[in-house]
Amino acid sequence: MLNSIRMPKWIAILLISSSSTLASVSLIRPMITYRALELGASPAQIGVLGAVYALFPIVLALFLGKNVGRFGEAKYIVFGASTMFLLAIGFSFINSLFLLMLATAAIGISHLIGVIGGQTMISTRSPNEKLDGFFGYYAFGASLGQMIGPLVGGIVAGSDGVLPKSTSMGFLAAAGFALIALLPTFYWRNQKIAIQQSVNQSGTFTAAVSMLKKPGMGKAIYISLAISSAVDVLIVFLPLFGTENNFSPFAVGVILAIRAGTSMFSRIFLGAIAQKLGSHFLMLISIIASTIFCAAMFFARTPIALGIAVAIAGLALGVGQPLTMSLVSRLAPPEDRALAISARLTANRVGQFVVPASAGAIAGAAGAGSVFLGLAALLASSIFTAL
C-alpha cells in the first residue's frame, strides 16, 4: 500500500510512529474517564480532567515550537513517545482523582511534544504542492491509531456492565503502543535539522501575535480550534454518554474506533481530492457535515444509531483537521513554520481546555447528550469563518 501511494520513506516511518503514539493516547484517555468513574467522579470532574489535559500545553506550545530548530523534530518525537510509555505504566497504579489529574496533565504535555515534532517535520521537509497530501498521510496515521487504540482497550480492559473489568490492563496496553512508537525512530538517530527556525528577538509571544495578523491565519487557526475541540470532547464524553445509556465499554470502544476509521478513510486520498475540489470548498463542506451529525448524536439512544452519526461526523472531521495543518503551513515562510504549527496547537489546546470544562458543566446539568449540541454550535460558528 505504501508503495502504491508513493509515500516517501521518512513519511512512512513517521506514520508508523505517530499512529502508535495516537493508539496509546487514544486508549489512555477513555481509560482515564473510566478510572475517574470508578473513583466516583461527577460529570463536572470528568470535564475538568478533560480540560487539564490541555492546560499546560496552552502555556508551553509556543515555547516548544520556537525551540524545535534548536533540538530537532526527531528528538521531540522520541521524547514524546518515551514519556508516554512511562506515564502509561504509571496510570495503572493511580487510585486518587488528584493524582489522576496530575498524570493527565503530564500526558497532555507528552503528546504535545510529539505532535509538534511530527507536524514540524512535515511542514519543513515537504514541498508546498505536497503539503495537503503529506499532512493527509500524517492524519491518516493518527486516525489509524485512534481506531486501533479504543478497540484494543475495549478488548483488553474487558467489560463489567457499563465499566471495564480492568482499566489497569488498558493502561498497560497503551504502554505497549508507546513502546512500538519508539522503535522506528532509530532511523532518525543521526538526522539533521531540516530548516533552522528563525529567532525573533521580540519574544515568542510577540512573534506569534505578529503571525496571527497574517491574512487568513487567524481564520485557519479558529477552524482548527473548533474541529480539534470537537474530536477531543467526543473522546472524553462518549464513555460518559455510554454509561448514561447502558452501553458497554466494548460498544463505546467500537464507536470511538468507527469515528477514527472513517476519518482515516477520508484522509487516504485527501491530496488528490483537495486538488480536484479545492481545499477551501472541501473544508467548508466538511465543517457543515460535521455540524449536522454532531447535532444528530444528541438524538441517538442506541449503539447502532450513535455509531452511524459518529461515523459520518468522523468522515467530515477527518477532512478538516489536515487541511488546517497544510493551510497554516502555507501561510507561514519555511523558517517560521514550527512557530505557526505551535500557534495552531496552542489554539487547539485552548479549545480543548475551555470546551471540555464547559461540556462537563452542561453534562452535569442536562446530561452528556447535550454536549453534542454544544459541539454542533461550536462547529457552526466556524462555518462563517470558512466562508
Please give the residue ranges for each predicted region.
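Core transmembrane helices of Major Facilitator Superfamily
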Residues: 25, 106-118, 312-324
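Juxtamembrane intracellular "pre-TM" segments in multi-pass secondary transporters
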Residues: 1-8, 190-221
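C-terminal membrane-cytosol helix-exit motif in multi-pass small-molecule transporters
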Residues: 175-196, 385-387
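Residue-level signature of mid-helix packing/kink "hotspots" within the transmembrane helices
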Residues: 54-62, 146-147, 260-268, 352-353
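Helix-to-loop junctions at the C-terminal end of transmembrane segments
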Residues: 60-72, 266-278, 363
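Structural signature of the two symmetry-related core transmembrane helices
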Residues: 75-89, 281-295
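Helix-loop boundary and gating motifs at the non-cytosolic
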Residues: 8-54, 219, 223, 228-241, ...
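Cytoplasmic helix-loop-helix junction between adjacent transmembrane helices
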Residues: 105-142, 327
